[in-house]
Each structure stands twice: as structure tokens, then as C-alpha cells.
A protein has these predicted regions:
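Class I S-adenosyl-L-methionine-dependent methyltransferase catalytic core
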Residues: 1-11, 18-201, 205-254
């Protein structure tokens, strides 16, 4: 509950977009900043794309159901087994990576941009689960007892995620009433197009976690980075929040 009348909100540390999403459900126009391009993409997709999808619900759902069928019955991945992936191949079993890349190819071939973005988010949402990695605070290699064989079933997890998204579009997309607007990756450099009534945020956690490195699999999958060498460049744009984060980086605005 917001105790004042609010028509516009700014979220300087967007994260996964909780504040803009709730604002949009109340019909409040929101603006946000987020240094992680993958997280910014997720936020825009689950608000703006889902809102737009509600206007052409049947078409979007039909496309997603067709994609689901192609992934389950017609996925051509054998020729991708053993491909190099700019050093990221070490994080996956060879067949898992081949299937991820085959599904990504199907997604990129979709002609409908809303369905394409929704499907990208669906694929990115399973990438850690089907990899050799696990998130326990930070992203790290999973120990032998931390993964089950079914965790590596790419087609199962992707199609299950599509089912969840199709349900949400069918029954909940009308709850998203207002768009959100990405203004700048860095909150310190953001220029808002108008005065806002309210700033609501969950500031960066003081825990030393590197949220760029934590999403490196998603960043790579959706082509926000090519190699791990680009991660420090993205990370340097963030606000240092934790003693373990302090480094000798230069020329970082305060």
C-alpha cells in the first residue's frame, strides 16, 4: 500500500523488475535503471511485452504452442554437439548445450517479436538449471550430489516454462496496466523525462555478490556478452556494495 497518490515511480536499481511490475499492476507509470542488461531485458519483457501480448493473446499463445511442439518433437540438435561456445562450453554437458542452441535458433526464427522476447526469457530462465552450475548465493560448479539427471532435460524444463508463461498470458496479462520505461543503465547518470512522485527501491545488497558474474550464462545465451572477458566491464558500472567488491578500478563515478 502506498500512502500517497502516486502516478509515476522511479526504481534506480531495477533488478528483476518487482517494483515496476507492481506499479504497472496499479496503473502507475514507472521508470527504472539497471546495470545488468539481462535483468533489464527481463523487466521490459514481463511488463511491456506481456502487456502488449494481452492485445493479441490468441496469436501469441498459438505461436508459443507451436514452438513447444517443435521443441518436443522436431528439435534438430545433433549437428550442434561439440560446438565451441566462446569458452562457455565448459559449463554444460555437450548435448545440453546443443539443445539450448537449437532451441535458441528456433526462437530467433520466430517472426513475431513479442513471442520471440517471451521465449528468450523462458529459455534463459532454465539455463542455470540445465547447466553444470548451481546458484548457492553465488554461481558455482555443482557438486555431484547437487544435480539430478532430470535437471539436464532441456526440452522438459523449457516446455514446462512455456506452459507457465502461456497460462500467465492467458489469465493474468490483463493485470499489467502500464508500461515501464528503461531510462539508463546507471542510476547516477539517469535523466528522467519528467518529475516522478515516488522513488522505491531495494538498494544493492552489502554482500559482495557479483550479480553480473552470477548471470553470465544468461548474458551469454541472449548475446549481451560474447566472452567472459566482458564481465568486468559490465561489473565496473555497478555501485560497489560490500567489502569484497572493492577493487582498484579507476574512474568510476561516485
Amino acid at each position: 500500500h502506498i500512502p500517497i497518490e502516486v502516478k509515476t515511480i522511479y526504481e534506480p536499481f531495477g533488478g528483476s523488475g518487482t517494483t515496476p511490475l507492481v506499479a504497472s499492476q496499479f496503473g502507475i507509470q514507472s521508470y527504472f535503471s539497471e546495470i545488468n542488461p539481462f535483468m533489464a531485458f527481463v523487466t521490459k519483457t514481463k511488463i511491456n511485452t506481456v502487456k502488449a501480448a494481452n492485445q493479441k493473446k490468441e496469436q501469441i499463445i498459438t505461436i508459443l504452442l507451436k514452438l513447444k511442439e517443435d521443441v518436443m518433437k522436431n528439435l534438430k540438435f545433433e549437428h550442434l554437439i561439440g560446438v565451441t561456445y566462446d569458452g562457455f562450453e565448459k559449463y554444460y554437458k555437450t548435448e545440453v548445450l546443443a539443445k539450448l542452441l537449437a532451441i535458441k535458433k528456433l526462437i530467433l526464427e520466430l517472426n513475431e517479436p513479442l513471442a520471440k522476447n517471451i521465449s528468450k526469457v523462458a529459455l534463459a530462465s532454465i539455463v542455470v538449471k540445465v547447466s553444470n552450475m548451481i546458484k548457492r548465493g553465488d554461481l558455482r560448479y555443482a557438486k555431484e550430489n547437487e544435480k539430478k539427471e532430470e535437471d539436464f532435460d532441456v526440452q522438459l524444463h523449457f516446455t514446462n516454462k512455456l506452459d507457465e508463461i502461456i497460462y500467465d498470458i492467458d489469465f493474468h496479462s490483463e493485470s499489467v496496466q502500464s508500461d515501464t520505461h528503461f531510462v539508463h543503465s546507471d542510476a547516477r547518470l539517469a535523466t528522467l523525462p519528467q518529475e516522478v512522485d515516488c522513488v522505491i527501491t531495494s538498494p544493492p545488497y552489502l554482500n559482495g555478490t557479483n550479480y553480473i558474474r552470477n548471470t553470465k550464462l544468461e548474458l551469454k545465451l541472449l548475446d549481451f556478452i560474447k566472452s567472459e572477458k566482458e564481465l568486468p566491464i559490465l561489473h565496473s558500472g555497478g555501485i560497489m556494495a560490500g567489502i569484497n567488491s572493492v577493487s582498484k578500478r579507476r574512474n568510476i563515478p561516485i
